């Protein structure tokens, strides 16, 4: 019942208005006798909660119908807040099916900002932060290549960026016209940018430099 109440707090459809207690209070109706509804906190969000007897835990299932309006991490954070207020604790979460990369990138950046950490880290590291903070690996390992749409669709066999350094060098030295000067210059530039970012990240997290963040 408490899990369902949390879902009602957040979902767009909200709950039926009642006098006093949200669960047992008298239903408030309009002039035509129809129950009035109290909207939830988030647009484009459907949700329901129930208790799973065999596991001894409550679960809330959400369906985000527009991730550009309502973000996964905002729903997670608010769920944790409402659960704590009811004496419950969120122990983890699970994604069903595949998820757009943007969802986890946005979540990872959000949590990094909360931790006052640099956002200038590799994309997969940002996603890792999201996975660990959201508890997406609570039930089973979260494989980025299998669970994120963009990674799952990528053809790894024909992408230069997925080559090892040795294979890339060997390919460059072959009779093939590509990779050529452009690829080498781009990679050299990327290494320079990565090194500069490393220095910035080391400085940003240096003890005594918190006020310079």
Positions of predicted regions on the chain:
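A structural-propensity feature for long, helix-poor, extended segments
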Residues: 205-213
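A generic structural micro-environment signature
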Residues: 51-54, 70, 178, 184, ...
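A broad, structure-centric signal for solvent-exposed, well-ordered loop/edge residues
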Residues: 100-102, 179, 209
């Amino acid at each position: 019942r408490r899990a369902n109440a949390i879902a009602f707090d957040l979902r767009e459809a909200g709950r039926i208005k009642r006098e006093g207690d949200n669960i047992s209070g008298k239903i408030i109706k309009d002039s035509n006798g129809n129950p009035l509804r109290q909207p939830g906190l988030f647009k484009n969000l459907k949700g329901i909660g129930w208790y799973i007897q065999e596991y001894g835990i409550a679960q809330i299932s959400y369906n985000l119908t527009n991730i550009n309006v309502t973000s996964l991490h905002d729903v997670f954070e608010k769920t944790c807040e409402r659960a704590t207020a009811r004496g419950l604790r969120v122990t983890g979460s699970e994604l069903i099916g595949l998820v757009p990369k943007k969802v986890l990138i946005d979540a990872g950046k959000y949590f990094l900002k909360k931790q006052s950490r640099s956002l200038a880290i590799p994309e997969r590291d940002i996603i890792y932060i999201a996975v660990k903070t959201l508890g997406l690996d609570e039930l089973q390992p979260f494989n980025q290549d299998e669970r994120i749409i963009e990674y799952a669709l990528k053809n790894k066999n024909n992408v230069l960026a997925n080559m090892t350094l040795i294979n890339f060098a060997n390919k460059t030295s072959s009779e093939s016209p590509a990779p050529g000067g452009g690829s080498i210059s781009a990679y050299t530039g990327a290494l320079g940018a990565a090194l500069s970012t490393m220095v910035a990240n080391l400085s940003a997290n240096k003890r005594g430099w918190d006020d310079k963040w």
